[in-house]
């Protein structure tokens, strides 16, 4: 029994060291920005009907999606933050850029300000971003 204890401790130590090494590698991976992308935040009345239907089906829970226009002219990126208990929320698009293999988007949900009169009704904040069509995958941050 005593001979097995050092072997078990050694195995546990090896697994821990491997875990630490693997996690360090993925964190050090830098994404090289190729260029910032021009985009438009689309108001509800200008969102394609099919996309609006998808948003309405998903809006209860947080969601992220990309949608291509039927003519492949535009790419729509949508980020929804799910049901919120009050009104007064907004969403900022903090970054949207192209890398060598993906489009990265960073958004932020902004709560109601302390000075703002808050409506006590459930809301479903989301943002729809439109840009010229690109094939790259979208990475949501």
Predicted feature locations:
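Exposed, flexible binding/inhibitory loops of compact, secreted disulfide-stabilized domains
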Residues: 4-9, 19-141
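Classic N-terminal secretory signal peptides
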Residues: 15-16
